[in-house]
C-alpha cells in the first residue's frame, strides 16, 4: 500500500473517532477533511468501518455496564428499564431514517445545509446551556431516566438525520432541554449511540456490501483501529470535561466551523460528491 494513502486513511479514522461523540458533526468534518487531504477510497465501505470502530469504543469503555445489563435483562428491574429506555429513544430516528433516507440525502446532503445546521446548532447549545444554568436539572443519573425522558431524547435525535446537526449534539441538548443533568445526558447519548450506529451500519452494509473488495481491507482496518482508539480517547475526555465545564466552547466552534465550510465551498476547496 502507498504510504500516503495509509496516512490519509489513518487521519480519517482519527477524525471520525474524535468527532463522533462531540457535538460538532462528524459528517461535516469527514467531508471537509477528506476533500482537503484528497482521500478518495471506497468511500461508503470505509465510512461504515470507521463508524463501527467508533461505536465499539463506547462498548469497550462501558463493557462492564453492558455486561451487567445483558445478564440482568428479564431479572433485574434496573437493567430492564435501561433496555426499555434505549429502545424507546432508538425508535423515532430509526423510523424517520428508514422513511426519509433517500430524500434527506438528495435534498439536504450539501454544504449549505451542513453549514446552516452547524451554526443553528451552535446557537441552540448556547441557549440550552444558559437555560440549564438558571434551573437545577431534574434528573442526575442514567438509571433515574423515565420512558418519557427517553422518548424526548429520541425525538431530539430525529433532528440529527439532517447532516450537520450532530447525533450527540441533538441527543445531549435534547436531554438537557428536558431537564436532564449535563453529564447524565452525555452518558445516555453514548449508550444510545450503540444501537443507533449498529443499526445504521447494518443498513449500510446491506446496501453497499457489493462494493467491498479485498483490495480495501488494509485501509479499512487502519481506519477502523484509528477510529476505535480516538473514539475511546474522546469518550473519556468528554466525560471528564462535562463533569466540570459546559458545552459552550463547542457551540462557538460549531458556528465558526459552519462559516468555514461556506467559505471553503464557495472558494472551491471542497465538493460534495
From Swiss-Prot:
Membrane topology, from the record: Multi-pass membrane protein
A cellular-component GO term for this protein: plasma membrane
Membrane-spanning residues: 13-35, 45-62, 82-102, 108-128, 186-206, 219-239, 250-270
Any GO BP annotation: cell wall organization
UniProt key word Aminoacyl-tRNA synthetase: no
InterPro entries to which the protein is assigned, alphabetical: UppP (IPR003824)
Organism, as annotated: Neisseria gonorrhoeae (strain NCCP11945)
Other remarks in the entry: Bacitracin is thought to be involved in the inhibition of peptidoglycan synthesis by sequestering undecaprenyl diphosphate, thereby reducing the pool of lipid carrier available.
Gene name, Swiss-Prot/TrEMBL: uppP
Keyword Magnesium: no
Alphabetical UniProt keywords: Antibiotic resistance, Cell inner membrane, Cell membrane, Cell shape, Cell wall biogenesis/degradation, Hydrolase, Membrane, Peptidoglycan synthesis, Transmembrane, Transmembrane helix
Reactions that this protein is recorded to catalyse: di-trans,octa-cis-undecaprenyl diphosphate + H2O = di-trans,octa-cis-undecaprenyl phosphate + phosphate + H(+)
Protein family membership: Belongs to the UppP family.
GO molecular function, one term: undecaprenyl-diphosphatase activity
UniProt protein name: Undecaprenyl-diphosphatase
EC number per UniProt: 3.6.1.27
Localization: Cell inner membrane
Function: Catalyzes the dephosphorylation of undecaprenyl diphosphate (UPP). Confers resistance to bacitracin.
Amino acid at each position: 500500500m502507498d504510504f500516503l494513502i495509509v496516512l490519509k486513511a489513518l487521519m480519517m479514522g482519527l477524525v471520525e473517532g474524535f468527532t463522533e461523540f462531540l457535538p460538532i458533526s462528524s459528517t461535516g468534518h469527514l467531508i471537509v477533511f477528506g476533500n482537503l487531504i484528497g482521500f478518495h477510497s471506497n468511500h461508503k465501505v470505509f465510512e461504515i468501518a470507521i463508524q463501527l470502530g467508533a461505536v465499539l469504543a463506547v462498548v469497550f469503555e462501558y463493557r462492564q455496564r453492558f455486561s451487567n445489563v445483558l445478564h440482568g435483562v428479564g431479572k433485574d428491574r434496573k437493567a430492564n428499564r435501561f433496555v426499555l429506555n434505549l429502545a424507546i429513544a432508538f425508535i423515532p430516528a430509526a423510523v424517520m431514517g428508514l422513511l426519509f433516507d433517500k430524500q434527506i440525502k438528495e435534498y439536504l446532503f450539501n454544504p449549505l445545509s451542513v453549514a446552516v445546521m452547524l451554526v443553528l446548532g451552535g446557537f441552540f447549545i448556547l441557549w440550552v446551556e444558559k437555560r440549564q444554568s438558571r434551573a437545577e436539572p431534574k434528573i442526575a443519573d442514567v438509571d433515574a431516566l423515565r420512558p418519557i425522558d427517553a422518548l424526548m431524547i429520541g425525538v431530539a435525535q430525529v433532528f440529527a438525520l439532517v447532516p450537520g446537526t450532530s447525533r450527540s449534539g441533538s441527543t445531549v441538548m435534547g436531554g438537557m432541554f428536558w431537564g436532564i443533568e449535563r453529564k447524565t445526558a452525555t452518558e445516555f447519548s453514548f449508550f444510545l449511540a450503540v444501537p443507533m450506529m449498529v443499526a445504521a451500519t447494518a443498513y449500510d452494509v446491506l446496501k453497499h456490501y457489493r462494493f467491498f473488495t479485498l483490495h480495501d481491507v488494509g485501509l479499512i482496518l487502519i481506519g477502523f483501529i484509528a477510529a476505535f482508539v480516538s473514539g475511546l480517547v474522546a469518550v473519556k475526555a468528554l466525560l471528564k470535561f462535562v463533569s466540570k465545564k459546559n458545552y459552550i466552547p463547542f457551540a462557538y466552534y460549531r458556528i465558526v466551523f459552519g462559516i468555514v465550510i461556506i467559505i471553503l465551498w464557495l472558494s472551491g476547496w471542497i465538493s460534495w460528491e
